[in-house]
Amino acid sequence: MPAAPFSVIIPAHNEGNVVRRCLEAVYRDAPQDALPEVIVAANGCTDNTVAIARDAAPLARVLDLPVGSKVIAMNEANALASATPRLFLDADVQCDYASLAATADVLRQPGVMAASPALRMDLSRCDRWVKAYYRVWLTQPYVTDRLVGSGLFGLSREAVERVMPLPEVIADDLYVKESFAPEERRNISKDCNGESCFFVVYPPRTAFDQIRVEERRLRGNIQLARREASGNKNRTRVRFRFRYTEELKLLDIAAYVIIKSAVRILYRINKLRGLSDEWTRDEGARAG
């Protein structure tokens, strides 16, 4: 069998409801002579994630790690992976082979360290508050300035040597993004043939779940800021950019501000209650 052109690492903690669709997308239309090396790093699972992953992707290597830690799972899988470029894909995200391969191609270019396909949000099952929130979020500099992360990031061989193994952080994707200068990152929307490259994220369905997930992201951002107190020139600056347009209504901006304010309040409450290290994720978007 020929060497794999790239590796795909999928950390998964109790992702039995979604890991099949993730794996089916990874292998969709993949040529038999260029199959990726796929490692599913199931960690601390108490559901059927491992069994479903093995059934959905017989060619993948499925780890059954005892500790429920995304970062540890990514590091364990990375230590076993043999191919580069190396792409790290959340189990609740979908990205097809063509987009993964196009990202890997970009990562072979000189000077490119980290890359992601274009981000698409599936808001079809979200309430009006969440839809309004993401209409604003998608216009913010974090997303528009060479986004790497939010469910998928790829690393070149040199980048793997630079950032792996990852430290124990909440915001692993932000840590990776900030490890590279803007000119070292790429966000690609088209492959060399002009075909669309993207991955699909399924955000929380309700405003309440969105607030809980955003509070975890805030904790991750604050944790990174404290780690990098000595200064990081690649640090993502929190900048909000609001401009009323035909697509972006004042009500959208209001919803965004309200949710962000609620996130800050929840963060302070959790800190007072000693819950600042508790892992939070959205279960609604993972439901069938």
Regions found by a protein language model. Give the residues of each.
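A conserved acidic beta->alpha catalytic loop
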Residues: 25, 39-50, 67
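Short, acidic, metal-binding catalytic loop of nucleotide-sugar glycosyltransferases
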Residues: 24-35
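Terminal low-complexity segments of carbohydrate-biosynthetic enzymes
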Residues: 193-194, 204-206, 212-288
